[in-house]
Structures are given as structure tokens and as C-alpha cells.
Amino acid sequence: MLVSYKWLKELVDIDVTPAALAEKMSTTGIEVEGIEVPADGLSKLVVGHVLSCEDVPETHLHLCQVDTGDETPRQIVCGAPNVKAGIKVIVAVPGARIADNYKIKKGKIRGMESLGMICSLQELGLSDSIIPKEFSDGIQILPEEAVPGDAIFKYLDLDDHIIELSITPNRADALSMRGVAHEVAAIYGKSVSFPQKNLQESDKATSEAIEVAIASDNVLTYASRVVENVKVKPSPQWLQNLLMNAGIRPINNVVDVTNYVLLYFGQPMHAFDYDKFEDHKIVARAARQGESLVTLDGEKRDLTTEDLVITVADKPVALAGVMGGQATEIDANSQTVVLEAAVFDGKSIRKTSGRLNLRSESSSRFEKGVNYATVLEALDFAAAMLQELAEGQVLSGHVQAGQLPTEPVEVSTSLDYVNVRLGTELTFADIQRIFDQLGFGLTGDETSFTVAVPRRRWDVSIPADLVEEIARIYGYDKLPTTLPEAGGTAAELTPTQALRRKVRGLAEGLGLTEIISYALTTPEKAVEFAVAPSHLTELMWPMSVERSALRQNMVSGMLDTVAYNVARKQSNLALYEIGKIFEQEANPKEDLPNEVNHFAFAICGLVAQKDFQTQAQAVDFYHAKGNLDTLFANLNLKVQYVPTKDLANMHPGRTALILLDEQVIGFVGQVHPGTAKAYSIPETYVAELDMAALEAALPSDQTFAEITKFPAMTRDVALLLDREVSHQAIVTAIESAGVKRLTSIKLFDVYEGATIQAGKKSMAYSLTFQNPNDNLTDEEVAKYMEKITKALTEQVGAEVR
């Protein structure tokens, strides 16, 4: 919100500098982003009167004689297409400074002496987006009353201080000059002074010319007035200056009046050309699927049933709360104007403006809320301004559909409630003074009082809001420093936080380095490594396609990080991340996705460097699986690894799904060579786990076992097996023998070679047995080995060598 300091002083009688005002507002709840004076950096810019203007043959130039208040006219060569004799212009005399600190000097153009420069507004540093279109390609023409030789700043209000406010969603009442004036008046204990317009109505009633109706619950109220015999022309300079300083381009007097009322009241308005209506009944309704509308910017908008439209003869003529339609826009030939003032549901407007990427001053105010109490007042004010600036005749009365509550909202509390929460010792007289400054009504006493909150402050509705208002006006800096009276509560990690912290510690203990990757990625990468892809959740208006969809896996983001580092000659990497993936089982356009915590890691390169006594050792599947085994052992979880070829981006012979209680919770393996090539990375091993599943499976209680004093006994067994039999199948068979004293199963050798028949392999295991309460005997261990051998023979066809 850009606030004109000059305009503000017309509404509130304050005698403070803009800088002091900005500091005071920032400390009372409305942050000031900065203060800008458009004239800063500009100098020696004066009013010039073009006495004569001659075309220079065979050029686009003009040789002008300009009166700048000196004894003799000043000769200036100008190339602007709209320069002509008789107009008042902006002249930068030699030595002047214009935008970008450019200094004007005497010069010669095509051999003709030029003693200055006739300036456009762009050359004064104003943005193209706010300059009237009639002057966008030429010089600015000043009002007739401008005096040659005068500094131009006062004629264009370039000497005004523009205060930029950062308005939070709860203070949308400050999105208007009246709202800001009320705030400033409360801060300084002043009264507001709002100008009144003398509205003179004709004998003809508005209801004779137009009627309105509402056909949607998202239209809270809709009101109109009609102004006849208007003369569409440029607005007076003061109004153009005011709009440009607020960041709005002047269009014509009719449109400018609606924008003025928007800034003044915070009430969005629209003006229709009545003569372009096919019917005299306006209906505000929901759009129908398949309908479309060409808006004022010339774009065709395809509508949905979630959009609100203003219709005439059942045809959309405006996108309610967002932008008007081109078919009924005001132009130079318009004579009868229909003014619209309405209140639309903020959520509906937000959806429409977001879907169409069409945000406007009007839509932002409807989204945040408008003052119910001034809808009709703003409508009457706009009609009176058209009467004044466009010589229009205002039809009597207005037509309205839908009524809104305008009476103050009553909120009750007590003095004790206030003081306990602020740590103060305020008296009831203090409270009365503060609410009087705010313009709120107050009845009752210190035991219990009721505050009548005006509709302009729709953010105040509960006792806590009243406490905030008291604190703001009393002064946050005056609040005493106090300690909480309630006893403290010992902090405790949630199960999710505890698991996250433990996994992070284990990962870093394994030598992994934490990274944080983007949750937004491409639609392809979002599902690239997902075990069970769901509906894709995409942004409607992404900054780039690389950040357009919410990820459903974390590995793709980790591989981007691997690629980034490999490209910079860092090829030995061990990375991990704990973050969220986003699963969407419903409609992504209507429902939010489920956020699920995942853990993932990626390793590549060497785990051991070559030296005088050690060979270089590259990472492999077993390093990745070993990391997971350590993790699961420390979490006291038992998982299964099941080989899989179903993950297209993983190596079909070096990938396994991870099962916990028969449910897939993740995967581990080598990235498919084709995928690795696409990422420009070397052989890389990755794993990803669902941490929510881990948390659900964690044992609730930990049982500590006494360390036994009795020795363990170990037996080695070599097995001849079919080549297809996996290590997991062998472990499962050994465990199925049900030997309770078996405490460890370790694979220490795998052999395939000439001494083994084709299609076979040898696998050697070391089995450890221990009785925590007694010594084991050789006979007992022999029985255990017999049971295990039998299970291996029956289940995997193993032959003990």
C-alpha cells in the first residue's frame, strides 16, 4: 500500500515528519517498508511554455522556442511526436539532473543549438506502467495554469513523500486512505476529517434504468447507481498525480474516479457503459462451464463454475471482483455510466485470480476483506465525483441486492483480563482513553466492559484482539518486563522428532553428510524413483518447469546434488537427507497432499583410497545395505530384503525392496546405468525409507538383557546351492529351524569357479550359539546344527560340503 503523505495530512491534522510517522507506525503494528520522494535526485526542472514549434526537414525533430521564465526564450531541439506550440511542458535546463543522475548540458543536434531538454515522465524516473497512455510515447503536457519558470514538482506532486506500508492479512483495513487515517489518528490522539461531497440527484430514479439480482451465495451484496450525460475526458492533474503516486495509471475521469474511491475507501468499484448493455438487468452469479469472457486487458478467459461473473442478458460482462469485460468498458463515446459497488466472497475471488494468474488491486482487497459499512457511502461518493468531474447527472437512489450487517460488533472483557495478559496495571480510565482514540465505543466498568467495534475493523472480534489493540496504542515499549506466573512444563520430543534425531545421528555416524534438496522438481523427476506413484501435485503458475511439481521421492533430488558435485570434481560422496514427500490419492486441484517423512541416502566413488598397503575400494550394494543394517539394528527393527526388477530407474540385478512386517517401506540398490548417464553421474547406490512406517513399528518399550558370562560357540558350514538362491532365503531357512541359542549368522565366503559345477555356487556361513544361563556342550551344538542342516536341505536344496 502506497500512502501519499500530502493526502494523509488532509485527512488527519498531524505535525510530524514522514520519517517520524513511519517509525511510529512500525512500532504500533503496521510495518513501513520505506519512504520515497519522486523528486529526489532531480534538479533544475522548470515549467516551459512552447512559443513556437517548427518541423526540421527530413527528420522527426522539432525546433522549439520555449519560455522558461528567463528574459529571452530558450531554443530547444525536441523529437517528441506530441510537442506543439502553445503547450506547457517540463524543461530540464543546462545543469539539470534527471533520472539515473544524468546531467543535461548545452549541445548541438543536426547543427542546431539546443539549450536544454523537454522531458517525458520516463526521463524523470517514473515507470511506464503508471504513465498515462497519451503521454507514454511522448512528453508530458502540464496544466494550463502552470507558470513558466516555476519548478515543476508542485504541479506533478513529485515533492510528495510516498510511504510504502507492508500490510499483513489481519490489517486489511489499512488498504485504504481512510483506514490509514484512522490508524494515524489513533496513534497520535487526533480526529479524522473526511471530506463530504454534495450529491445532487435528478428526478429520475435509478430503478427506472437498471435492476440488480444475486444468484450465488458467494455474492454478499451488489449495488449500483446510474450517472447520465457524462463527458469522458482526462482527469484533472491533481487526480492523475494522486493515482500515479499510488502506482496506478490514469485512464480517464470515469475510470480514475473508481480507482480514487478504491484507494480512499478500500472499496473496489467498476464502471460499465450502460449503452453497451443488451438488457437492463444485472445478475451476479457463478459462471457456467464453457463460458468465456474477454477482459479489459484483451485476453480471453475460459471460465469455470468456481468463478463469479456479472451478467447482462445472461452474458458475462465482468469477472466479478477481478476485472471488467472489454465489451462494456468505458470509452471516449460513453455517455451513461453504471457504477458497481459489491462485496464478494474472498475465497472465491482468490481461487479465480490465482487460477487465471490475474491479480488486481480489487481482487487483493476482496481476498482480504472490505468494510461492510461503507459500501453504499463509497458508491454515493463516486457518483458525486462523476457529477463534479464529468458533469454527469446522477439518477436518484440506488438499486441493491443482498444486505450486509453494518452495526458495530460487540466484544466483552474485563480490566483484569487485560492486565493479566499484558503484565500492566492499567486503570479503566486508561482503557477508555485508548478506545476513544481508536474510535471504538465503550460501556461498562472495570469489572466487565463491552467494546463496540466499528465494521471498519473486522479483524477485532474476540477479547484477545482487544488486548492487542490496547497494547498497540499504549505502546509495546511501555509494557513492563514480567515473568510468566504459570509453572513451566518440561520439554519433551515427540516420537517423530525423537526418531528424526536418532536417524540423523546414526547417518552421520556412518559418515554420511546431510543435504537439503528442493521439494519442488520436474513432473518427471517427481515420480522417477517412487515405489508407488500417486497423483501429481503441480503448481498452477510455477517460476520454472524445474520447480513445478511436488516430489514423491527424495532420490531424484539427491542425484541432482550428486551431479552438481561430480561436475565440480567431487566424486567420492556419501549424502543423506530427511525430508517430506507428497502423496496425493485424491484430486490435487481440490485436496492437499499427504506429507510423509522419508529418509534417503546416496553413495558413490571410493570408500577407501589407495595407499602403500591398501587397494582402492569402490562402493557397492553391500556398503549401501550395510548402512541400512546398522540403522535397523540400532532401531531394533527386523526387515527383509526382497530382490526386485520392478523399479525402472534402478539396476534390475542390484536392487531390493525393504519389507517391514510384510509391508514395503523402501528400497536399496544401484541407480540404473541409463539413469546415471542421464544425470551425468558415476555408479551410484541409493536407498529410501518411509520414516512414518519406521516410527509405527518401533517397539514401545525397550527390554535390556543382562550380559552373559558364559562363552559362545561357533560353527562354520559351507553350502552347495543353486546359483539363484539368495542370501536372504538362506537366512530365512536357518531361522526357521527354531534354534533359540543361535545369536548370529554371518556370511564369510561366496565362491563360483571351475571346481564348482555349472549353475551352482558355494556359500560359507559362521553360526554363533550362546546360552545366557549356562555353558553349551558340543552335543547341544551338534543337535542345533543338525536341525539347521535339515531346514537348509528341505527349503533351499542346500548340500552341506
Swiss-Prot record:
Residues 39-153 form the tRNA-binding domain. InterPro entries: aa-tRNA-synth_II/BPL/LPL (IPR045864), B3/B4_tRNA-bd (IPR005146), DNA-bd_dom_put_sf (IPR009061), Fdx_antiC-bd (IPR005121), Fdx_antiC-bd_sf (IPR036690), NA-bd_OB-fold (IPR012340), Phe-tRNA-ligase_IIc_bsu (IPR045060), Phe-tRNA-ligase_IIc_bsu_bact (IPR004532). The keyword Protein biosynthesis applies. Residues 406-481 form the B5 domain. It comes from the Bacteria. Its cofactor is Mg(2+). Keywords: Aminoacyl-tRNA synthetase, ATP-binding, Cytoplasm, Ligase, Magnesium, Metal-binding, Nucleotide-binding, Protein biosynthesis, RNA-binding, tRNA-binding. Signal peptide: none annotated. Its EC number is 6.1.1.20. Residues 708-801 form the FDX-ACB domain. GO terms for cellular component: phenylalanine-tRNA ligase complex. Binds 2 magnesium ions per tetramer. GO terms for biological process: phenylalanyl-tRNA aminoacylation. The keyword Cytoplasm applies. Mg(2+) binds at D459, D465, E468, E469. It is found in: Cytoplasm. One of its GO terms (molecular function) is ATP binding. It catalyses: tRNA(Phe) + L-phenylalanine + ATP = L-phenylalanyl-tRNA(Phe) + AMP + diphosphate + H(+). Tetramer of two alpha and two beta subunits. Belongs to the phenylalanyl-tRNA synthetase beta subunit family. Type 1 subfamily. This is Phenylalanine--tRNA ligase beta subunit. It comes from Streptococcus pyogenes serotype M1. The gene is pheT.
